[in-house]
């Protein structure tokens, strides 16, 4: 499952302060990068998933994700925020990094679940979280996250 995350999919110092601002940014970038054709549909899917249950994890990370016919291929984006983002999380702490996963609807039971599982497992490792929080090089960040996909 290689090449679903490239350096051009990594964004540093994003100014978002709220989950809505973060999801809007991710939706726009999904269209700009050619993964989707309709930013509003992407945003609606991300918000619908968020309404089912927060994608905010622990220790400053979130895994916003959506499945949509609108997605042309599987894509992962990493967004590091300039400051704390208000996001409902399991530990009540703000988010510093979002790893967004976008998958076509037909891959909802396969690729989508596999990617979510692999990212969630890696986020349990302190070294992985630390590497993501301290690295400011898009190439290296892409390689770090890509490394968790088997």
Please annotate each region the language model reported.
Residues 1-150:
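Cytosolic covalent-transfer regions centered on His/Cys nucleophiles
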């Amino acid at each position: 499952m290689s090449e679903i995350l490239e350096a051009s999919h990594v964004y540093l110092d994003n100014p978002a302060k709220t989950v809505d601002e973060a999801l809007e940014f991710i939706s726009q970038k999904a269209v700009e990068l050619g993964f989707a054709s309709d930013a509003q549909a992407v945003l609606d899917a991300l918000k619908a998933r968020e309404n089912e249950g927060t994608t905010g994890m622990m220790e400053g990370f979130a895994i916003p994700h959506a499945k949509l016919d609108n997605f042309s291929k599987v894509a992962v984006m990493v967004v590091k925020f300039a400051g704390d983002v208000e996001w409902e999380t399991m530990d009540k702490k703000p988010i510093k990094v979002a790893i967004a996963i976008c998958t076509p609807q037909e891959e909802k039971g396969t690729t989508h679940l596999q990617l979510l599982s692999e990212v969630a497992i890696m986020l349990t490792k302190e070294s992985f979280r630390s590497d993501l929080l301290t690295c400011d090089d898009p190439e290296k960040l892409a390689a770090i996250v890509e490394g968790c996909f088997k």
